[in-house]
Amino acid sequence: MMLSIVRSVDVVLEIDLAAIRANFQKISTLVGDKVKVAAVVKSDAYGLGLVDIARTLIDAGCDLLFVANLDEALLLRSSFSRVAIAVFRDEFDRFGTWYRSHGLIPVVNNCKELHAVGTAGEPQSYFLNVETGFSRFGLSVGDIQREYLLRTFERYRPSIVLSHLACGECISDPMNQLQRDRFRTVYDLLKPTRGSLSASAGVWLGKSYHFDMVRVGSALYGIHNAGVQTNPLKPVVKLRARILDVRSVPAGEAVGYGATFRTDRASRVAIVGIGYKHGLPWSCANKIFVRLAEYSAPSIGRISMEYMIIDITDVPARRCSPGTFAELLSEDFTVNDLGAAAGVSPQEALTRLGAGCTRKYLNLFPPSAAFTANRPTEAMSNPSRAKSRPMDKQALI
């Protein structure tokens, strides 16, 4: 018999859904009416919760979602019956039955998948990925030119041709123009197929990079391009963690693993219930501050698995007693700032925190007509009837 212990939550990641809606609308306004805004919700919506974030975006008017794999796509389809769902990976030539039976759109990444689409036995909508300088996925420009000469695209034309910028976050990098020009070659060849070159970073590069659609992920979640001086996006997350204990430490004493910090005065320190288990980067030790009401307190010593230690010597005791919550992310210190302090991308920092912390959603508005139209039918609500269960890929290999 297992003993169940009810415990208070020590770490809370607050997610402002109104801010996500506002960011979607802001980007839609920025790119203009002629450019579609699709939402990237891969990796559990960057750790913020796939279904909850998808519901928010559908409510904001989004009608196309991109996910990483079929597992995520099937989870979405079991909740939303009508929204278009595109899958970046999981090959159509191996899993075509799953795509067709659940109305999913494959992103075709090589010639083998392309030909599998053509021999599917029934029309299959698909997006075509072209490699323009990232060296990750996609058909080369030469591959596409060859298939064009073979009239492949006359028999089964892609709905959208897409690519991905390697250096979009650096506005002046010449790679951006090189990739845009390569993409333009394929885009012009395959007209009237629509084109999508830019993800979040490319939104800020100007209209010549927008084509017919932008695929926005990190920008929706408040991560801004470091190359853009003004940030019009709303911050989406706040991170709070509970103070578990307060201690007095003499001058000259070591703090934490490795004795990487020693007090230079008689100090008061607080042990905060957040560590790298929760996604706080180990590398941000001794580099960040937490907020305690109107006061700030520096992180000292290494980040451990469950805890971090902060110096509260200059903070009044009434502001930092055990049980008090310290604020690690806010409008003043964002996930961009945390990533910079830790030497990781803000996308990595956010995804780790989202996976490791208890989430609390703010501003859950009533669903709009757009969301209501996407409510699953009875069959879609029942995974056994809709067959929208997590994929057993091993059985198909």
Curated annotation (Swiss-Prot):
Copy the pathway line from the protein's UniProt record. Answer: Amino-acid biosynthesis; D-alanine biosynthesis; D-alanine from L-alanine: step 1/1; Cell wall biogenesis; peptidoglycan biosynthesis
**Enzyme class, spelled out:** isomerase
Which coenzyme or cofactor does it need? Answer: pyridoxal 5'-phosphate
* Record keywords, A-Z: Cell shape, Cell wall biogenesis/degradation, Isomerase, Peptidoglycan synthesis, Pyridoxal phosphate
Q: Where is this region: Disordered?
A: 373-397
* Superkingdom classification of source: Bacteria
N6-(pyridoxal phosphate)lysine occurs at: 42
Is the Isomerase keyword given for this protein?
A: yes
| Catalysis performed (reactions) | L-alanine = D-alanine
Q: Which SUPFAM superfamilies match?
A: Alanine racemase C-terminal domain-like, PLP-binding barrel
> What GO cellular component is one of the record's annotations?
cytosol
Q: Which GO terms describe its molecular function?
A: alanine racemase activity; pyridoxal phosphate binding
EC number per UniProt: 5.1.1.1
Query: What NCBIfam families does UniProt report for this protein, alphabetically?
Result: alr
Which protein family is it in? Answer: Belongs to the alanine racemase family.
Name of the protein in its database record? Alanine racemase, biosynthetic
What organism is listed for this UniProt entry? Answer: Mesorhizobium japonicum (strain LMG 29417 / CECT 9101 / MAFF 303099) (Mesorhizobium loti (strain MAFF 303099))
List the taxonomic lineage.
Bacteria, Pseudomonadati, Pseudomonadota, Alphaproteobacteria, Hyphomicrobiales
